[in-house]
Amino acid sequence: VYNVPKNSKTPKACRAGGCGVEYTKCQVDLPRLQRKARLYVGIPEKKEEGERFPVLYMHDGHNVFSDEDAFDGVSWGLIQAYRDWPGLPRIIVVGLECANGGRRFDEYAGFPIAHPGLDRFIPKPVGGKGDLYLDTIVSQIKPMIDQNYPTISSPEYTGMVGSSMGGVITHYAALTRTGVFSRFGSLSGAFFVSESSVLHATERATLTGVHKFFLSVGTRECGVGDQEEYVRVNQAVFAALSKKMPPERLRFEIVENGIHHESAWAKVLPSVIRFLFSDIGKGLQHPPAR
């Protein structure tokens, strides 16, 4: 038995059951970030008594589960992924809605952003508030999830995934929060926004607490950077990670014709979940001490 937050609602996309995942959404106050956000939590259906699950935290949470919640009507399709691939590892997925406009760049960057292409969108210095954002997840969101849902709370069973700037903050968490998370995924990471800082920090990090890391980038990315820039900088990040991690724990995929959009990330999502959590297997009856 678990207790969802009192203002939680079950979206239409999952009311009929048979999803493989049942999910709810609620609004939470984030005092450190001085904003409110919707929080989405998906948990496997047909749970056994005493069963507990690994947890995956995802950025841009409104785009994770279904099209009805997504910003432009297209999601990562996590609900559909579990319908199409019922053998995917059974995990709890937590999605936190992002901030609006330039504040998203602030929260999703661990380092100050220095890229001329951003001037078109945000006419002021941004970035560098990633620690504040990650502290919110670690100190507020994760304890709430662990208290109310059947999680396995230890780092070796906890992951984080994001796309674009969400990939940037996920990578930063791999450098700075391995006492909490150990499995990471970055899709179409926009690392060029603070490339030198990202690569320098990666080269200095030990990464001994990183159990798995999945990177992917498309050949037809768009946005602030150009197509070649996305591929080049993701290759550079992969090269830096590969110096620190054994090859079986690191995966890098260049997706032919992959674009910078949720529809493209939805196609990669099953591979991400499978790679990050397949060594754990099904939910555990007797989890490690919490």
Predicted regions and their residues:
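Non-catalytic cap/lid and distal C-terminal segments of serine-dependent acyl enzymes
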Residues: P5-R290
